[in-house]
Every structure is written in C-alpha cells, then in structure tokens.
C-alpha cells in the first residue's frame, strides 16, 4: 500500500477544512476530535483508506453520514477526479458541508441532505456508485445494509472502524458480500457481482 502525501495546495485546503470544522463544531457537534489531533485522526486515517482502496480514476464515491466531511471532503480534496456525494440527514450538518465545499471550491462534491436509506432507493443513486466510504456512522452490519443499495455490483464499502478484523468476522457469513480487514482500522466490504 503506497502512502499518499498531500501537495502543498491540498494541505492548505485540508487545514482550512479542519479550521472550519473546529469553528462550526462549537455549534453543531460535528466531531469529538480536538483540533490538535484532527490532522492525525481525520486526514491521516482517510489517506490510509485512500491508499488501501486504490480508487480508480473517475470513480463515483458516496460518504454515508458525512457529518463534518470526514472522510468525504478529504477524499474530494485528494482526488479531484472523483465525484463525491456527501450524504448527511441532519440539515444543519448538511449546511456545513455545503459551506465547506463552496469555501474550498470543491466542484466535485454534491451534498445530499437525505437519509442513506432514501438514497439507495433513488434511481439516480441505486447501484450507481463505485465506492462508499464512512466513519463512525453505524455498526458495520447496519452500514453494510445502507451501503449495498448504493454500490454497483463489484463496488466496495471502505469504512474507518475501530476493530477491522472483528467487524469483518461479524460480516463473514453475509450473502452477497465479501468482507476483510484491509488495514488497521479499515474495513472493506465488496458487493459481489450477480
């Protein structure tokens, strides 16, 4: 797994995102991670996910329960070739995501102020995405239920979780998916082709 390092311009955008996240967090409770640990917890962990996932050029990505934009905004900054949809049911948090996408001039982001369950049934999103990413949104079995309708056959869910081997083991017998611990703290679940 090759390390991914932000350019100076990307680092600037990511730092602005973290600064805004810190300011807005006082009103919206977007993250429990303090600003002095945000780079490590938000950016570096997402960079690890991107390195493990080896996302193909031009892929369609969805971040379920985006909240403060982790990992979705980091993915959009690091990979401007991707189209990234940030799903956030809380309209106030979705407002933050719209603000940050505009502030950072991220034209590859779309914000959907909806529930993931609704998006999976929407013909514009049902089985239209190559990759679903998420962090601390739901227990892995529920996250898989939310992600599978959004993924194309062969698409993959990449989730930042605490114990990836245990999460993968809990999903081992689930029909239609293949789960594995891709790296420490990273769960991968592939939607099998029909």
PLM region spans:
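Conserved SAM-binding loop of SAM-dependent methyltransferases across substrates and taxa
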Residues: 68-81
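Residue-level preference for alpha-helix termini and adjacent loops
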Residues: 29-32, 69, 118
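Short, structured coil/loop segments at alpha-helix boundaries
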Residues: 7-11, 72, 89-90, 122-123
């Amino acid at each position: 797994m090759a390390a991914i390092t932000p350019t100076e311009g990307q680092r600037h955008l990511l730092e602005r995102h973290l600064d805004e996240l810190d300011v807005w967090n006082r009103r919206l409770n977007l993250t429990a991670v303090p600003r002095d640990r945000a780079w490590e917890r938000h950016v570096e962990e997402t960079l690890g996910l991107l390195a493990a996932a080896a996302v193909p050029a031009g892929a369609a990505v969805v971040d379920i329960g985006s909240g403060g934009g982790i990992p979705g905004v980091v993915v959009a900054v690091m990979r401007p070739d991707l189209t990234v949809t940030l799903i956030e049911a809380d309209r106030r948090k979705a407002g933050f995501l719209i603000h940050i996408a505009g502030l950072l001039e991220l034209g590859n982001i779309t914000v959907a102020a909806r529930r993931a369950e609704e998006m999976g049934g929407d013909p514009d999103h049902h089985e239209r995405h190559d990759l679903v990413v998420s962090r601390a949104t739901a227990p892995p079995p529920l996250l898989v239920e939310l992600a599978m309708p959004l993924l194309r056959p062969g698409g993959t869910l990449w989730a930042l979780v605490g114990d990836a081997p245990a999460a993968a083991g809990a999903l081992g017998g689930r029909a239609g998916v293949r789960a594995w611990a891709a790296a420490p703290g990273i769960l991968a679940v592939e939607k099998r082709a029909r």
